[in-house]
């Protein structure tokens, strides 16, 4: 079948790394071995520099919400145009750790940036480019943040309030409910059950794709 762009989304501590491993295992079982991995923000030299600024800040300067979202879209368009689109064009599959849905949820939901502005930014920067499938790993923010804290020091965004992540989750769920290409996975389950749910959702989706 033709190359596809699959994205894994979720709050901090949702288990995106484990989900990626599961996705790769399912794809390889289907004979799909040419896989490119991406992360957002990041994935190109410029985008990685922006990632550091977004996550850590610089010299204590306050990063405004609109500056943050513009930096995210600058990093995203670099990744899409320089990595993702070329990979898809040469027949590779792309598995991404976050994409535009993160901005719609974190900046649109968590930060409260106007949803029309967020949609306009997406459409202006990305045009009609969208993932073929998004796996959204859903879990209560308190659970995810506890997992993130257990990993070590939190970055600038991970230090946001629980209310911020509650708003972010609510926007994720709202967007997932209105888009058939987004599959919601209960990430509060034990890891084995989460992997099984991902495998089932991905396998079912693959059976509905047109062969080459």
Swiss-Prot record:
Recorded catalytic reaction(s): these are: dTMP + ATP = dTDP + ADP
Parts forming coiled coils:
none
Question: Can you tell me which residues bind ATP?
Answer: 10-17
Tell me which InterPro entries the record gives.
Answer: P-loop_NTPase, Thymidylate_kin-like_dom, Thymidylate_kin_CS, Thymidylate_kinase
Q: Give a yes or no for keyword ATP-binding in this entry.
A: yes
Record-level GO cellular component terms: cytosol
Which SUPFAM superfamilies does this chain map to? P-loop containing nucleoside triphosphate hydrolases (SSF52540)
Instruction: Give the EC number(s) under which this enzyme is classified.
Output: 2.7.4.9
Q: Which Gene3D superfamilies match?
A: P-loop containing nucleotide triphosphate hydrolases
According to the UniProt entry, its GO molecular function terms are: ATP binding; dTMP kinase activity
Q: What class of enzyme is it?
A: transferase
Per the UniProt entry, what is one GO biological process? dTTP biosynthetic process
Per UniProt, which keywords does this protein have? ATP-binding, Kinase, Nucleotide biosynthesis, Nucleotide-binding, Transferase
Which family does the record assign? Belongs to the thymidylate kinase family.
| Summary of the function given for this chain in its UniProt record | Phosphorylation of dTMP to form dTDP in both de novo and salvage pathways of dTTP synthesis.
- The identity of this protein, by name, is Thymidylate kinase
- Which organism's genome codes for this protein? Yersinia pseudotuberculosis serotype O:3 (strain YPIII)
| Lineage, broadest ranks | Bacteria, Pseudomonadati, Pseudomonadota, Gammaproteobacteria, Enterobacterales
Q: Which gene encodes it?
A: tmk
